[in-house]
Amino acid sequence: LPEDFSYHFDVIENIKKQFGKDIVLLIDTCLCSITPDGHCGVTNHKTINLKDTHYSLGVAANTYLEAGADIIAPSDMMKNTTKYLKKTIGINGFIDAPIMSYSSKFKSNLYGPFREAAKSSPKGFDRSSYQLPVNDRERAIKSSINNAAQGADYLMVKPGMTSIDLIADIKSNTLLPTGVYQVSGEYASMTLLNKEKLGNYINLLHESLLVFKRAKADFIITYGARDIVSHL
């Protein structure tokens, strides 16, 4: 089972020591970059072992918080992860630690660049058993509602641009801050358009962020954060 997160502890602790309260650390809490088959949970015979997955995610979450993380962000999309983490971090003294759930995360073809960089492309079977089908609006909204009921403090749709139609309904049903994740494929498409002189990267990025705000996203996660800040 993945249960040694000492490397993550050292990185988080050193960042907080250097920047202190000038930085807020939201730590993606998942297993895909450390499991042998690239899945977001522990697998046995091409199926997810939910008990072992929750255990490892709990160890990770508590390790991150002990190191100084401000918010944990489970992105695994397994059943009842938010509920499990809320309980286990509470037992370890982090009852007030916020959880930002990747609550409406779709099985998408737009994650390719990240998976290549993290070497986390799934092997053996795909992620359709736990990530959402892109055509099921009702299930996606229900997923966020369920995560809110389990104790999530922040909700999210992912990928960003292909999910903006869900934000308003999720917010009205949960009354929780709901954001978007502009994923690696979205980001790469803008940089490639710029490279081929078919569009200006900064203009494309700015336009996409304005669309997220128009859709009432409360926060935006993007690989272009530092780029857009330098142009504001």
Can you say where each PLM-predicted feature lies in the sequence?
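Alpha/beta enzyme core
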Residues: L1-L232
